[in-house]
């Protein structure tokens, strides 16, 4: 999930410009030959890279500049360490896209995001509904300006909003006004 935003210094709001879900689950027959020769995981990374590059190119053209990409750091079940491999590969794809487009990249952990948006440490494994509820509360408090409905976007795009909000609080570009 991707979330493109800017900070409004006058209103102290994170203004959501766009959200996007990279969906490579639906078949794309343009990649069939490559998949036969190189396997599913390699083609999955190629598709992710192509989609991310298309999105960044389009948004840089539209907004003239993207300064920072905030990436949710890896988390995986330690009982299945091979699950980390595609996550690391996708981070490499993302880093390469950032380098190619002149965008700085930082990472934020899911736990740090959850604490920043107001989920207690005890609920570190909070479900998606808890995250959605807290993001909606930030929208209601006008910390995040989003003209759409959270019901119309994916949980990954909602997470991306939380990750972006967290980094802006860390960088002190937003001041959280609990009310």
Name what the model sees in each region.
Residues 1-179:
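Phosphate- and other anionic-substrate recognition elements at nucleic-acid/protein interfaces
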